Amino acid sequence: MDLSTSGSLPCHLPLSLLTNLQTPPIDTSFSSPPATSSSSLLSPSPSSAFRPVVPKSLMNPQPAMDTFYMSAIQSLVVSTTNDDQYSEHGALEGSKSLAKDENASTSAGTILCQVCSDKASGFHYGVFACEGCKGFFRRSIQQKITYRACTRAEDCLILRNNRNRCQCCRLKKCLAVGMSRDAVRFGRVPKREKARMFEEMQKTNVQSQRDQIAIQYENLTEVMHKINQAFGTLQATLEKCTGPIYTDRCPITSNFIVIPLKAAIDFANSIPAFLSITQTQRVHLLQNSVFDVMLLASASASTSQHFPPGGLTYDQSSANPIIPQAIQSISARIRQLPPQTVPILTAIAVCQADLLPESQQPMLLAERLWCVLGKLGGIQSLATAPSLLADVRTLRQWHSDRLRQMSQISQHFSQNLLIAPVAAAAPVLLPPAFLSPPASATSTSSSSVKSEFIERHPSIASLLERPRRISSSGAQEPLNLSLPHVRHQVKRDVDSDEQLEEMKVSPVPTTLSE
């Protein structure tokens, strides 16, 4: 089947392995189970003294991505300072008692300043605030300072790293969150009131997180430079790690998996505000989006050098035709997008909100990336991107199902090699030379080894030529006396020994004949 009508298929897709592996045909329907169920394929054979015990890990194979793939992502995702705060939150979770001091530690985590989202030092002027905002508000009220008017329509984002940029908007936000000179409290805040204030503070944390993300996307040029640079590095890494699939099979080694995986994680880390997500959440997002990232990066790369002029042709009997055709169609749609929008679309695939529905931060990050995509690609990109990401997600599920089926077949094949000899009726799976080696090859190899040994040790060559002396210690294997010809042979040996003992003559080696 020729797929050249819809464009060439990128060779360094994760599914490029499936178009080259010579496996038995598998049912192309993903809705109905195959004719031979996995339970029947993996059912253990009857126990026998000539068959080894197969480990349970082979009888119950895990999914393809549950071992090396998952552990590699967990080891490659680095921890950040935010993880320490959330680990403290995990240690304090479940405790109903609040902290005794005015510090930020409570049963729900760290309390942030309601003005700049920095770590709050206590309850100041009616709100939780940091030392910087507390001092700024006190100076502004006591000295009655009139600040210069804002040049950005009084709509500046006030965060920890830019709170001194616009003092007019900072004072305005102090008043907006409820800071008042009359609300100053001396002494300790009661626990009940502090708990109530903290609940209200939790409601405003979403807005604070949105502001923290938005401040990192103010400079659109810098954002695009970071993402495009990491995206180009990812494409170059994928091209180096794989070769042309129409000339040789793709190698399945640790470098073949780890190096592209590290490049995909580096691309995710280049997304502004992505490292502000906790390590556990980033691992979960990457485990469910690495395939999407590699597919989008591969489809948008230049792959003309990896394919013959007539396009890519594959054997229908050795691959599932649905998956290559789907990749071909999605790749053509990706190449029709504006080039500057593909890196942003890939970043959106990493931060999809449905991959981590319990967290607000990935959803807020995805919202900001959608805004960037709209500015770069316009309404057309916003209209086509959701359906494209949905199709990529469906293809990811097909890919997982395909690998799981291949894993079951390979495990069943390994069991047949361990449990029972392979029948001669399967020349496709094993070469004939492996199934039944010729006898001439065995005799030739054994004789050549013996001759080489004699040449290296001429001093014992004569010993090898002498007839073997039969030991009289009785250390030979016990004979089965139930056989008639064995009983006759034993009787003749006993009579011969008695005659020799009577004659007092040393026995002379003779050749017995039936």
Curated annotation (Swiss-Prot):
Which Pfam families does the entry link to? zf-C4 (PF00105)
What family is this? Answer: Belongs to the nuclear hormone receptor family.
- Has UniProt tagged this entry with the keyword Metal-binding? yes
What highest taxon heads this organism's lineage?
Eukaryota
Q: Name one GO cellular component term.
A: nucleus
Q: One GO biological process from the UniProt record?
A: intracellular receptor signaling pathway
Task: Locate the region Disordered.
Answer: 28-48, 465-514
Q: What InterPro entries does the annotation carry?
A: NHR-like_dom_sf, Nucl_hrmn_rcpt_lig-bd, Nuclear_hormone_rcpt_NR1, Nuclear_hrmn_rcpt, Znf_hrmn_rcpt, Znf_NHR/GATA
Zinc fingers (NR C4-type), as residue ranges, are 113-133, 150-174
Fetch the PANTHER family from UniProt: NUCLEAR HORMONE RECEPTOR, NUCLEAR HORMONE RECEPTOR FAMILY MEMBER NHR-85
Q: Give the signal sequence positions.
A: none
Q: Where is the protein found, in the record's own terms? A: Nucleus
- DNA-binding region of this protein: 110-186
Residue intervals of the NR LBD domain: 216-514
The main place the protein resides is nucleus
Q: What does this protein do?
A: Orphan nuclear receptor.
UniProt KW keywords: DNA-binding, Metal-binding, Nucleus, Receptor, Transcription, Transcription regulation, Zinc, Zinc-finger
Q: Which GO terms describe its molecular function?
A: nuclear receptor activity; RNA polymerase II cis-regulatory region sequence-specific DNA binding; zinc ion binding
Q: What is this protein called?
A: Nuclear hormone receptor family member nhr-85
